[in-house]
């Protein structure tokens, strides 16, 4: 049985929404990973060594999609090459130690009032002057534009299946899914609000990028399946912080 199938069975047995059970599971795993970093000697040494490294490329909340040449951070042990870390608020690296950081389809899963500002400020701390932060998120503005226009071709371009899924049968259901994804997503982003978040974290040079291209070439290792409906934004840390 799949994880979602088990959660559905547990939800029905307990009378608790699946979204609540998934959130509880994440918090339990995060607590375990934090304790592991203190109590497991191998994990403690791994994190200590990481804090001594410089000129890093960081792949934040990678899931099972690890990248060669990157330090891959992930809460769950999807792959032997990940360093386990709760990436929602901070990064386990030294100040100014990274020349590039990429965050693909993770920011929308974070609380926009608490976690997003903290993580972006910590990315700024971790980047060397001139370092680049690349963020990839669902482009909710495109979903909204397609909805307002009732433009089936625009939804097709966003890789929405035809006919619509059985559990998302209408135009507005598709838009809701882009924002919430069954409560896995916490916030929606367009260029304007993502720029505001980045400016608030200290970044001043914020630009829209494209799939597969970056000011730091390795950061452009974007996942193909996200390309049709993603927004790509890059921000640069100032060369000299006042």
Language-model segments: which ranges?
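C-terminal end-of-chain micro-motif
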Residues: 1, 241-242
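Membrane-proximal basic amphipathic "stem/tether" segments
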Residues: 1-53
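Aromatic-residue hotspot detector
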Residues: 6, 54-57, 84, 201-204
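Short secondary-structure boundary/capping segments
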Residues: 49, 74, 90, 223-224
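Short, flexible hinge/linker loops that cap or flank conserved catalytic cores
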Residues: 50-52, 64, 225
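Conserved SAM-binding loop
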Residues: 55-143, 192, 233-239
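S-adenosyl-L-methionine-dependent methyltransferase catalytic module, highlighting the catalytic core
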Residues: 114-123, 128, 132-241
């Amino acid at each position: 049985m799949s994880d979602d199938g088990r959660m559905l069975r547990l939800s029905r047995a307990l009378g608790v929404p699946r979204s609540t059970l998934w959130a509880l599971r994440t918090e339990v795993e995060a607590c375990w990973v934090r304790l592991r970093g203190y109590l497991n000697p191998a994990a403690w040494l791994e994190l200590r060594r990481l804090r001594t490294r410089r000129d890093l490329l960081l792949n934040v909340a990678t899931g099972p999609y690890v990248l060669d040449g990157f330090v891959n951070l992930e809460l769950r042990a999807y792959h032997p090459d990940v360093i386990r870390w709760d990436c929602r608020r901070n990064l386990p690296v030294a100040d100014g130690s990274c020349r590039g950081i990429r965050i693909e389809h993770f920011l929308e899963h974070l609380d926009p009032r608490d976690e997003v500002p903290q993580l972006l400020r910590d990315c700024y701390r971790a980047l060397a002057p001139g370092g680049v932060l690349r963020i990839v998120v669902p482009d909710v503005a495109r979903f909204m534009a397609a909805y307002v226009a009732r433009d089936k071709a625009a939804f097709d371009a966003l890789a929405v299946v035809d006919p619509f899924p059985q559990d998302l049968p209408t135009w507005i259901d598709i838009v809701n899914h882009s924002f919430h994804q069954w409560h896995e997503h916490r916030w929606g982003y367009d260029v304007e609000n993502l720029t505001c978040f980045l400016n608030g974290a200290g970044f001043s040079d914020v630009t829209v990028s494209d799939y597969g291209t970056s000011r730091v070439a390795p950061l452009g290792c974007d996942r193909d399946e996200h390309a049709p409906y993603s927004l790509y934004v890059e921000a640069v840390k100032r060369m000299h912080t006042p």
